[in-house]
Regions:
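Conserved C-terminal beta-signal and adjacent last beta-strands/turns
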Residues: 6-8, 19-22, 505, 516, ...
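Gram-negative outer-membrane beta-barrel transporters
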Residues: 37-39, 396, 461-462, 569, ...
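Acidic, small-polar-rich N-terminal luminal/periplasmic segments of exported/outer-membrane proteins
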Residues: 39-188, 559
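Outer-membrane beta-barrel translocator/receptor signature
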Residues: 139-141, 153-157, 162, 166-245, ...
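Acidic/polar loop-and-plug regions of large Gram-negative outer-membrane beta-barrel proteins
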Residues: 249-251, 256-328, 355-374, 423-433, ...
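Face-selective signature of the C-terminal outer-membrane beta-barrel domain
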Residues: 322-355, 370-485, 507, 564, ...
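Membrane-embedded beta-barrel scaffold of Gram-negative outer-membrane proteins
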Residues: 330-334, 340-346, 352-356, 507, ...
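Structural signature of Gram-negative outer-membrane beta-barrels, strongest in the C-terminal barrel
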Residues: 381, 393-396, 404-406, 441-579, ...
Length: 768
């Protein structure tokens, strides 16, 4: 029996060579594009992502001038968090954002979840420098997490549109909003940065960046990160990662070419999912059996001790391994005074494994695998895309046309490896040298996305009124091929030739404005472990090949007002969203048990809510930021499952808190800075019938820092202390609603993650 080999990202792949050749080619045509110094200055084009990164301090954090609800994170916001914190966690201070994780810095991907206005992470759009990151799910099939895509310090700007994303966003999953990240540009002068973070759970993180400075329009930086920590619970379960980022900019005239490269390797001990029953019987800190191998063997053989009641209460150990390489080549060219071309080509390669000891005997046909084999889920992604936009400034109109095309080839397979004569693995779980015992499943997918859009932005009444008229055409074809385990083959297409988006903003005066927007969108059918075809061919044939399955769609309308003064800024927005043909996974087993989940169309979901934000800056020393959101998301229909009807009409959507509140107080004086952050999240349900829920909670974090300024040859030296979960609150953080069920009467559904205890981190940073 053979196993398909998915290689780790190569050190210098052919794709990177092609991108570098393309970069040189673009540089060679610069003399033919560069504007004549003697001609009049051209009309200023809209700020590009990189330009926005350079001028974030001048951009409204409440989205002043936008026709949609938009919120931004500033560099001051980021400083309230420890170095190395996931950029997603920083977003939790914004209205409508629910971010959860099981570790203090939000880095462990198995426990990461984010939702906006009742839309889970699978139904949002994410980009880095305009390039799609897929849906950032744990078992990703079309992208990668932002933590693997870029080192946190190299992010210059983060923007959240919680309900209606920009029409040109390169995403085929953004039914409920977008999150856009922008990488920082190389600095104009030579500099070197180094920081070292030490903290709870043996955390050690080193960050380094060197900027070349700008020479004749050419500038660059190279940056690296090394992270090493133990999971906060369990026995010496490491969470390690290494990353390298590099960026090159070449500016000539009013034109720019940039190349961004990222390589990352993550080896993480997963945090196990628990149930209400496990927490009650075995405690908040329950984890893997590691290093007690005899207890794991006994449990697999039905001999239970210390409150354990089933083999599924724990496994011996589990890990996730991910290797990624991302390359982005972008060019922005002023073709004439009124015509701007922006073009991007990118490539992403991922190879990954999720390895876990399997505490059950596996039997399939004539194959029997003894308990405590290693269950290995193997992932592979190879995607390439091209996107471009052409913007024409015609009087009071800004007309933009753009397209995006992406080819995404991804694989998912699951194997069992026999550990009968092997030494138990107490740290990172790997399958090297172990005999392959069974192929549980093997599938490959080929997804092709094509998207075209047209936008007209019209300003009038002395620029007080701005109108936007947009429309896009999108189609994604997903083809599955079953290779092993009896898994299915088939094809689905999601297509809509006309998805409109309209919006308006009106300036009442220099401080106040009102805005409104309406949008329709459609999501592609997912691939990999989230695909309707991720089951046996027999099950697919019983559903007539899913020929009647409809893609998920949404219609959103929002209305709001903003005020921005020197003393304070405030915004308020109300919204209504109808989400049709919502597809949910129905778990047929719990925990790590191998089985096929079902897919149900639960009809429509209606989401209504209110979002408020208020920021007060009484003087240069104090800043008080607040956000509040109320959301009411319910299922509009019952659904059929297993020949019966599940009564969910009127029930609250899983993992959707009705009320969230965030308050952040920041102080700085001379060389000192300090901050206190508080977050509240109300009760959340984790079953479709709402028979089971987790309680709401308050969390507090704090930070303190000192800037020594110039010390000898060092331009700047800083030290900071960050406290996470200041009052050591016990709470349920992540709900793995990918494995939700209709009900959980016995409390045995293993989809709960407990939150991290109080943690502390100290960072020393220097700049040359």
């Amino acid at each position: 029996m053979s196993i398909r080999s998915i290689p780790r990202a190569s050190r210098f792949p052919v794709t990177r060579l092609a991108l570098l050749i393309s970069l040189n080619s673009l540089c060679l045509i610069s003399p033919f594009i560069q504007a004549d110094d003697n001609v009049p200055a051209p009309v200023t084009p809209p700020a590009s992502d990189d330009a926005a990164a350079m001028t974030l301090g001048t951009v409204s954090v409440i989205g002043q001038g936008e026709t949609r609800q938009v919120q931004r994170v500033t560099q001051k916001d980021v400083k309230a968090y420890s170095a190395g914190t996931s950029p997603m966690k920083v977003l939790q201070r914004l209205p409508g954002v629910n971010f959860q994780s099981g570790d203090p810095l939000g880095r462990e991907e198995g426990s990461q979840r984010i939702s906006l206005r009742g839309f889970d992470m699978h139904h949002l759009g994410y980009t880095l420098d305009g390039v799609t990151l897929g849906n950032m799910s744990f078992g990703n099939f079309n992208g990668l997490s932002i933590t693997r895509a870029i080192i946190a310090e190299n992010i210059a700007a983060s923007e959240v549109a919680p309900g209606i994303g920009s029409l040109g966003t390169a995403s085929n999953s953004d039914l409920g909003g977008t999150i856009q990240f922008t990488s920082s540009n190389p600095e104009k002068e030579f500099s070197a940065q180094l920081s070292q973070t030490m903290g709870s759970y043996d955390t050690s993180r080193t960050f380094m960046r060197v900027d070349t400075g700008e020479y004749n329009g050419l500038s660059a930086y190279v940056s690296g990160e090394k992270y090493d920590a133990d999971a906060w619970k369990g026995h010496n379960n490491p969470q390690k990662s290494d990353a390298v980022n590099a960026k090159v900019n070449y500016n000539f005239g009013d034109n720019r070419v940039s190349f961004f490269h990222s390589t990352s390797s993550h080896d993480e001990a997963n945090l196990p999912s628990l149930s209400q029953s496990i927490i009650q019987r075995l405690g908040y800190n329950w984890s893997y059996y590691t290093p007690d191998w005899p207890r794991a063997v006994n449990a697999a053989n039905g001999i239970y001790t210390g409150g354990v009641t089933s083999a599924g209460d724990a496994t011996y150990n589990a890990s996730s391994l991910r290797d990624d390489e991302l390359d982005i080549l972008n060019g922005n060219f002023s073709l004439t005074d009124d015509l701007v071309l922006d073009a991007t080509v990118y490539h992403h390669h991922d190879s990954g494994r999720g390895n876990s000891y399997y505490p059950f005997i596996y039997t399939s046909g004539a194959t029997t695998v003894p308990s405590n084999a290693i269950r290995s889920t193997v992932y592979g992604i190879d995607r390439t895309g091209f996107q471009s936009s052409l913007t024409y400034f015609l009087g009071q109109h800004e007309i933009q046309a753009g397209f995006w095309i992406q080819s995404n080839k991804n694989d998912i397979a699951r194997y069992l490896f026999d550990t009968t004569n092997a030494t138990p693995q107490n740290h990172i779980v790997k399958t090297n040298g172990l005999p392959l015992a069974a192929t549980v499943l093997d599938q490959s997918y080929n997804d092709l996305t094509r998207q075209f859009y047209l936008r007209d932005t019209y300003t009038l009444l002395d620029d007080r009124l701005k109108l936007e008229f947009d429309a896009k055409n999108t189609v994604t074809t997903s083809t599955a091929k079953g290779k092993g385990g009896g898994y299915a083959s088939g094809s689905l297409e999601a297509r809509d030739r006309f998805l409109p988006q309209v919006g308006a903003t009106y300036k009442l005066n220099d401080s106040d404005e009102v805005f409104t927007s309406y949008s329709e969108n459609m999501a592609a059918f997912p691939s990999g472990g989230y695909s309707p075809f991720f089951t046996t061919q027999t099950a697919v044939d019983a559903q007539n090949g899913f020929r009647d399955l409809k893609p998920e769609t949404s219609k959103t309308v929002e209305l709001g007002l903003r005020r921005s003064t020197q003393l304070y800024s405030a915004s308020a927005a109300v919204y209504n969203t109808r989400f049709d043909n919502r597809l949910v996974a129905i778990t047929n087993c719990t925990g790590i048990v191998i089985c096929q989940n079902g897919v149900a169309n639960v009809g429509s979901v209606t989401s209504r809510g209110l979002e408020l934000s208020f920021g007060l800056t009484p003087n240069e020393n104090w800043r008080w930021s607040n956000s509040m959101s109320y959301n009411h998301s319910t299922y509009d229909d019952d659904y059929a499952s297993g020949g019966s009807t599940v009564q969910v009409k009127g029930k609250t959507v899983v993992d959707t808190p009705k009320l969230m509140y965030s308050s952040n107080l920041d102080w700085n004086r001379e060389r000192w800075n300090a901050g206190l952050q508080g977050n509240y999240i109300s009760k959340r349900y984790y079953t479709y019938t709402n028979d089971s829920s987790v309680s709401g909670y308050w969390l507090a974090n704090a930070n303190l820092g000192y800037d020594f300024g110039k010390l000898g040859a060092l331009k700047d030296t800083t030290v900071s202390l960050n406290m996470v979960n200041l009052f050591d609150k016990r709470y349920i953080s992540t709900l793995n609603t990918d494995a939700s069920a209709a009900a959980d009467p016995s409390g045995n559904l293993q989809i709960l993650q407990v939150g991290t205890p109080r943690s502390a981190f100290v960072t020393l940073g220097v700049k040359l």
